[in-house]
Amino acid sequence: MGFVTQDDVLFPQLTVEETLVFAAFLRLPARMSKQQKRDRVDAIIAELNLERCRHTKIGGAFVRGVSGGERKRTSIGYEILVDPSLLLLDEPTSGLDSTSASKLIVILQRLAKSTRRTIITTIHQPSSRMFHMFDKLLLISEGHAIYHGKARDCMHHFSSLGFTPEIPMNPAEFLLDLATGNLEDISVPGLLRDGSPAPQEFRSRVVAYLQAKYRDHAGDGGEGQAKQPARRPGEQLRLAIRMRKDRSINWFQQFVVLSRRTFRERAADYLDKMRLAQAVGVALLLGLLWWK
């Protein structure tokens, strides 16, 4: 399983290619040769459209580097190097403009279909184009599910319950309004308005109604009811440890790779012309102050 966090944790002084190469040397099985690992990195770079920036530094607060979308794709490449069957992403489009976000979702969709990999992502306020790229949707309100099924069927589902938009709007915007109880532009079943409830009570009533309808639907045998027999915890742990040992390099190889990565990352910082000038200037100033 791979997990891509919302904030990209990468070394700013390393290039995109160096980041993925060091990750490959650390995470890919020891039985693979160095050339095979480099070939795997080249394939990932091509798959994620990172060819143009492969020799560009990641960058950070004080280092100019790649764009936000390229940095996010590098983080994704870091995780899919080991070819996980399940990839989780925490709000991958946050902080990206609409064009970069759409390109990223297109790449994720291509990865899911070409490698038959399951990709699960949390996302806020996707555009209409992005929304229609999703296969399945899980909508959560106040920690409880109110819809789980095919993304293209969600509007019909809520319409059958009596919830329809009163103005043309993005399906994702409609769903988020439902989940948060923002019902100004949404028609709701009349029975929920009985007694002219206060706004807060009305929102709570609608959310509770949607949660109850989802539970009823799941209880009637909705999607995902068939379950595989679960392994015992001890068996799962032994299997995970065995798979980890099969994939890991030994501690000395890890030490060598980490040392090389640290030197490569810090050397560019320590040997920066501005830093050298500052160090020499401070040394000369202190030497003159204490000159006898």
Language model segments and positions:
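ABC ATPase C-loop
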Residues: 79-80
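ABC ATPase nucleotide-binding domain "signature motif"
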Residues: 50, 56-74, 98
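H-loop (His-switch) and adjacent beta-strand-loop-beta switch element
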Residues: 116, 123-156
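Topological signature of polytopic alpha-helical transporters
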Residues: 5, 22, 27-48, 54, ...
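Helical segment within the ABC ATPase nucleotide-binding domain
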Residues: 101-116
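Catalytic Walker B motif of ABC-type/P-loop ATPase nucleotide-binding domains
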Residues: 87-91
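Conserved catalytic motifs of ABC-family nucleotide-binding domains
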Residues: 7-18, 31-32, 83
